[in-house]
Amino acid sequence: MGINSYVSRPKGITNSNMTKMFQTIGLIGKPHHQGTNLTLTRLHHWLSMQGFKVIVEGRVSAELGADVCSMDLLEMGEHCDLAIVVGGDGNMLGAARVLARFNVAVIGVNRGNLGFLTDLPPDNFEEALSKVLSGEFETEHRFLLEAEVHRHGKITASNTAVNEAVLHPGKIAHMIQFEVYIDEQFMYSQRADGMIVSTPTGSTAYSLSAGGSILTPNLQALILVPMFPHTLSCRPIVVDACSTIKLVVSPENGENLEVSCDGHVHLAVLPGDEIFIRRSNERLRLIHPKGHNYFHVLRNKLGWGSKLF
């Protein structure tokens, strides 16, 4: 749609018509995690007391008791208008790849480490969440990536990613050879441990660890970050989000490779395969408490210095 991210600030609404905005709320969390289970239990009780219909993802529903309504993620996407993800960014990414196709609003409660995508505190979420449910929130749309593996002109595997798609060796780290094309224009051949193709959302994740730049979420851009390239002159490059990235794996690679989507989904790649990575038509509808500031998040999570005066 040509839009990577935008922010809207709806006016607040009264408690009497609060449920008109969100009526059915889904709860998703990290399975078998004590802190997550405690937060999910509190959320389920608190939301039910407020009169919302609450659906719990099947993987965590058993730990909340037999009387909860449970569905899998696909069913939740069809029935919920808001999903609350309890956990870290990894849990958010897993849910987002599914829920993005349904235009479900998603907000996170942080039970992980950094939590770039999870805004709400786990111990006192009630005040902030109450304001969100009454309409005091900001909406961001984050685009996803679509990765396809082509073999002899046919698609053998595909999936989507919120953060990044990564070409890399299978189980043993070693150097691989491949060519990189941008919109069918040859850019370079590469000998490296792999290639990261990241969205702005993913630029604070694996891409950042590999030396990539941080892209603000509203940028319509992708960043390509080589992993340990065998040349001193190779640097990350930022391209337009409308670009199609093609990685052609050299037939001389002796081992099977993989494309990982957000580190969760793995697509098998053989020597000679072509990987196409482009912006997906699906977008994650991420909501934040009112007053959300991206640079405040960066300062907090990355330990940047505060204002001097």
UniProtKB/Swiss-Prot annotation:
> What main location does UniProt list?
cytoplasm
Which domain of life does the protein's organism represent?
A: Bacteria
* Keyword NADP appears in the UniProt entry: yes
List the GO terms this entry assigns under cellular component, sorted alphabetically: cytoplasm
The family line of this record is: Belongs to the NAD kinase family.
HAMAP family on file: NAD_kinase
Binding of NAD(+): at which residues? 89-90, 163-164, 174, 191, 193, 204-209
Query: One MF term in GO for this entry?
Result: NAD binding
Q: Where's it found, cell-wise?
A: Cytoplasm
Reaction(s) this enzyme catalyzes, per UniProt? NAD(+) + ATP = ADP + NADP(+) + H(+)
Record-linked PANTHER family: NAD KINASE (PTHR20275:SF0)
Q: Which GO terms describe its biological process?
A: NAD metabolic process; NADP biosynthetic process
Q: Where is the active site?
A: 89
Q: Which cofactor does it need?
A: a divalent metal cation
The protein's role, per its UniProt record: Involved in the regulation of the intracellular balance of NAD and NADP, and is a key enzyme in the biosynthesis of NADP. Catalyzes specifically the phosphorylation on 2'-hydroxyl of the adenosine moiety of NAD to yield NADP.
In its UniProt entry, what is this protein called? NAD kinase
- NCBIfam families according to UniProt: PRK01231.1, PRK03378.1
Organism of origin:
Shewanella frigidimarina (strain NCIMB 400)
Q: Per UniProt, which keywords does this protein have?
A: ATP-binding, Cytoplasm, Kinase, NAD, NADP, Nucleotide-binding, Transferase
